[in-house]
């Protein structure tokens, strides 16, 4: 079980990413546009650097929805491998069963 502070930190990051998503996208569009002047590009870079560090989507970490475990996370189910196996063995995941050949 992950510490509740780690779960809270991830929730805070998700909120910041959502809050600054449009602003980040606009600044990146200015930076990546080849017709933008050097001064405008530099201003956009400085503004982008001025945004909170945690507002970048790359700083988010996928975590198990039940335990908060950061490793062994399966995107398709939103669970860690351990909790997915437990749910599968109980028959709670439709269409998923233990492999046998």
Swiss-Prot record:
Signal peptide: none annotated. GO terms for cellular component: cytoplasm; small ribosomal subunit. Pfam families: Ribosomal_S14 (PF00253). Keywords: Ribonucleoprotein, Ribosomal protein, RNA-binding, rRNA-binding. One of its GO terms (molecular function) is structural constituent of ribosome. The keyword rRNA-binding applies. Part of the 30S ribosomal subunit. Contacts proteins S3 and S10. This is Small ribosomal subunit protein uS14. It comes from Shewanella sediminis (strain HAW-EB3). The gene is rpsN.
């Amino acid at each position: 079980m992950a510490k509740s502070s780690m779960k809270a930190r991830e929730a805070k990051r998700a909120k910041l990413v959502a809050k600054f998503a449009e602003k980040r996208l606009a600044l990146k569009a200015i930076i990546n546009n080849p017709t933008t002047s050097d001064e405008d590009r530099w201003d956009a870079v400085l503004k982008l650097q001025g945004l909170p560090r945690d507002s970048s989507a790359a700083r988010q970490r996928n975590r198990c929805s039940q335990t908060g475990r950061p490793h062994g996370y399966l995107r398709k189910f939103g669970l860690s491998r351990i909790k997915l196996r437990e749910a599968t063995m109980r028959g709670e995941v439709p269409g998923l069963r233990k492999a046998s050949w």
